[in-house]
Amino acid sequence: MALTKIELAESLVEKCGFDKRIAKLFVEQFFEEIRSSLEKGEEVKLSGFGNFSLREKNARPGRNPKTGETVAVTARRVVVFKPGQKLRDRVENVKVKA
């Protein structure tokens, strides 16, 4: 099961007493700030959670798995997330559902 933005907003309503509309706006604005910072090329550091940054990937040859045909994979920019030590410690012994 995945945690959704709606569930995050509902948690703010239940645990913090936020109005439902305000909680939804809060969650939306939180993620918009992350997106906006990354669009500007800035790193996003969330203490105790982790860092989001951009990484450039070079063009490279690839292979179509269905046909085996060689194709060119273009250069691109990707978002990477590096979890912080506190997050790594909390999830270290969590069993992953297959």
Curated annotation (Swiss-Prot):
InterPro entries: Hist_DNA-bd, Histone-like_DNA-bd_CS, IHF-like_DNA-bd_dom_sf, IHF_alpha. CDD domains: IHF_A (cd13835). Pfam families: Bac_DNA_binding (PF00216). It comes from the Bacteria. Keywords: DNA recombination, DNA-binding, Transcription, Transcription regulation, Translation regulation. One of its GO terms (molecular function) is DNA binding. Coiled coil: none annotated. GO terms for cellular component: cytosol. One of its GO terms (biological process) is positive regulation of metabolic process. This protein is one of the two subunits of integration host factor, a specific DNA-binding protein that functions in genetic recombination as well as in transcriptional and translational control. Heterodimer of an alpha and a beta chain. Belongs to the bacterial histone-like protein family. This is Integration host factor subunit alpha. It comes from Actinobacillus pleuropneumoniae serotype 5b (strain L20).
